[in-house]
Every structure is written in C-alpha cells, then in structure tokens.
Amino acid sequence: EMERVHWAYVTVHSPCQLANPVLVHEKSYIDGKWVNALNGQTQPVYNKATNEVLAEVVDQGRQDTEMAIKAAEEAFQTWSKTTPHERHNYLLALFAKIQENAEDFARLIVAENGKAISDARGEVNYANSYVQWFAEEALRIQGYTTPSPNPSNRTTVIRQPVGVAALIAPWNFPLAMITRKVAPALAAGCTTVVKAPHEAPLSALALAYLAEEAGIPKGVINVLVSSRGKNESEMGKALCESTLVDKLSSVSYTHLTLPTICSV
C-alpha cells in the first residue's frame, strides 16, 4: 500500500512543501461548506513523481452533483443582482489571494500534475491573468442601441447572466483551465459548478478555499470531485440532465467528451 504523505512533514527539498498548508483540502466545496461524499467514498491523489499518496479526496456521484447545482441555482438569485463593480472587486480580491499563494500553487501543481516547477509557476501566472482580465471585463459588460429599419423603432440589446454554469476541467492545466472558465462566469453574474479533474483536483479545491477567503458568497463557486468510472458518469449525466444548468463548458479528456458525458 502506498505511503500517505503528511503535508506538515514533507522534506524541505520536496516541491510539495507549502508555506500555507491549509490550501490542501480533501473534501468538496458545496454551498460554502466543506463536505464529504454522500456515498462515503474517497479516492487517492498521487504524487506524479514518486507515486506516493498526497491526499484521499472525495469520490462523488449524482446526489452530490444535484446538491451543488441546487446551491448554485439559489446563489444565482442574489449573485446575478450584484453590480459590475461588486463583481469586479470580488475577482480582484481573488486575484490578490492567488498572488499571495502563487508559489504554493506551483508546488501543488508539480506534485499532483507532474509538470516542472518552471512550467507550474508559468501556469499559476497564466491562471491568475484570467482572473485579473475578467475582473476588468466585468466593468465593460454593456448593451447597445442601434437604428431599426422602421424609423419609429430602435433595437436595444441588454446583456444578462445566463444562470448556472457547469464547468468540466482537464488534468493538464488543473488551475488555469478552471480560472479560464470560472472568472468570466463570475464576471457575467453567473454561478458555477466545477468538476475538478480526478487526477489533479487539489488545485481546484485550493482555489475554492481562496475564493471563500476573498469573500465570494456561498454557492457562487462549487467544486466536485469524482473518480473515473461509475461516479464520473453519474456526475456528467446529472450536469447534462439538470434543468437548473443553463451553460455547460468542457475542456475534456479523450474518454470524456461532452457527447460521451451526456449519453452515459
């Protein structure tokens, strides 16, 4: 059996040593709470260099997914009514939190994803650039009015948030491909349900923790984790079938394309 690494005792030479070890979470984040899987199941996350077990994270299914979707739908009722300036400030606060913990994020990515530390640091900067960019874009969500063929009419376009966005992230950029989806959704006034990659879910859970620290309200960001197989299929099917999900975005695995998710 693989030895489980206790984060507090990782050697100084290890890329896993974190200045802020509270970033590491094994539970999922739903409606502002850290929760176990309703089925009681867990799954290991391995250090890709040593094959040691870094953490035992939750392994969730359909019921957990439906709970997260409901939380996002309820949060949408208030989040969608926030002003662009409020959403701008929330995203800037998250940007600052990620900046403060950039080196820890890089080390976490090295451990769970396996890329070199230089690449991991680049990913963190890349990931946070989306948060910064869409913080500013929140202020520029504007409608417009154009002339109509009928001189007595005008055509007016009003931009409104879609609703709950279900976001499926890949393993190869476990932080950047999540901020790339979450940041514009939040800027637009949408709430989110994130399916973290089961091979490398710790970055997504750390992001949820920092979002909480940044003051982002409960239910606006929800993060789920499932293993490859039955639970993942149940989760994908729940995301596709829910009438409360208004947007589905996936940068996905070869075995987990959107048609595959929605047909299982």
PLM feature spans:
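Glycine-rich loop-to-alpha-helix module at the N-terminal edge of alpha/beta enzyme cores
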Residues: 52-142, 152
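Histidine- and aromatic-rich ligand-binding microenvironments
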Residues: 30, 44, 56-67, 215-220, ...
